[in-house]
């Protein structure tokens, strides 16, 4: 009897622990449903100009697993330091490919190739890079080093 109760308690504890871990694995709310992306970009450009940085536009959606992976890679070192030192990051919610499509068009980001999709702007707003071939839409098959390489390639030259 004691063994049965013990096994039951261990199994119950494992189920509770597993349920708790699953709750933490939920997608983060990276892309705001209420943000004004036009305003966010303008504010990012103003900050980039003051701090001599570039702006990264990250087009995606909270439903997108690859977008979640990109965000994880953005928060790993050395990527987090590179972002903080050289870039202002703007997350732009594309909804189900029905939001902010005007911005994707303006910055020449073909959302039909998939998300996440990135664009890099100078502090003056000049388009320096736009993702053309869905390079980051398969983030789950890439690693953090590919993000590091991208950030190093597009960080501003030393002044």
Model features per residue range: what roles?
Residues 67-82:
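Typically the conserved alpha-helix immediately C-terminal to a functionally engaged Cys/Sec
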Residues 51-62:
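Short active-site neighborhood of thiol/selenol oxidoreductases, capturing the structured segment around
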Residues 113-158:
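Non-catalytic, surface beta->alpha helical segment in thiol-disulfide oxidoreductase systems
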Residues 11-20:
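Bacterial N-terminal signal peptides
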Residues 98-115:
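Structural alpha/beta surface segment adjacent to cysteine/selenocysteine redox centers
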Residues 25-44:
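N-terminal "domain-start" segment that seeds a small globular fold
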Residues 1-6:
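N-terminal secretory signal peptides that target proteins for export/translocation
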């Amino acid at each position: 009897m004691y063994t049965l109760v013990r096994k039951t308690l261990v199994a119950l504890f494992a189920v509770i622990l597993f349920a708790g871990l699953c709750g933490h694995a939920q997608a983060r709310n990276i892309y705001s449903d209420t943000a004004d992306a036009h305003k966010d970009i303008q504010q990012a450009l103003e900050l980039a100009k003051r701090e001599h940085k570039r702006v990264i536009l990250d087009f995606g959606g909270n439903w997108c697993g690859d977008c979640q992976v990109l965000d994880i890679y953005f928060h790993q070192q050395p990527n987090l330091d590179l972002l903080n030192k050289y870039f202002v990051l703007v997350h732009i919610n594309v909804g189900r490919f029905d939001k902010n499509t005007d911005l994707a068009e303006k910055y020449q980001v073909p959302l039909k190739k998939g998300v996440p999709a990135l664009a890099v702007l100078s502090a003056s707003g000049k388009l320096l890079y736009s993702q053309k071939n869905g390079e980051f839409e398969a983030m789950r098959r890439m690693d953090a080093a590919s993000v590091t390489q991208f950030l190093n390639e597009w960080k501003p030259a030393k002044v």
